Amino acid sequence: LESKILQDFNCSEFIYCSDSGLGSAANRRFNSLGNRAYIITHSLKKMKKEDREIALNPTQFRKVGSTKFIDLRTLDETDEEVYNTVYYKEVPVVTGNMDETLIVTYSPKYKAYQRRIRDRQIEHAEKIINTPGRKRKGKNQNDPMRFVKKTSVTPDGEIANKQVYNIDEEQIQKEEMYDGFYAVITNLEGDV
């Protein structure tokens, strides 16, 4: 696609923006040649564990326009100004021979939004558990069934005749750690 744009529009410069589905390393490499650049959404969940821990570490965030570092754990998210502010941090990343910057944002408002949605999905999952009948498997990241855990063995490890369904608290905790966070990766240089 980018090659076609270069040919058809005779562009000498452009910034490629996409979601992570079109953000492969090969696409990023191509879009770092010449006077091209890119900004691509980046999945925090799919990052290597050590990189994800750095990205989600609550220290070294800033408000846009400020050089002062903020520890997200110190925020009073009930304060309206804090609630409506987006915080960010930049993490240098080297992918092969490409120097990139991961920009991680945190928004208390986005966190609250994600929690409201998940709470409704958990309520739906509880209704499914309490409704007699066969249970289906969760199909995607928005399916309430992803919060349902099926147990088919007894605590002693014996095979059970009956399957027991419960809310999967571990799955809820895994998802909660990403609440409020969003990331993009770019090769653009300069101030955020």
Regions found by a protein language model. Name each.
Residues L1-V192:
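Anion-binding and metal-coordination hotspots
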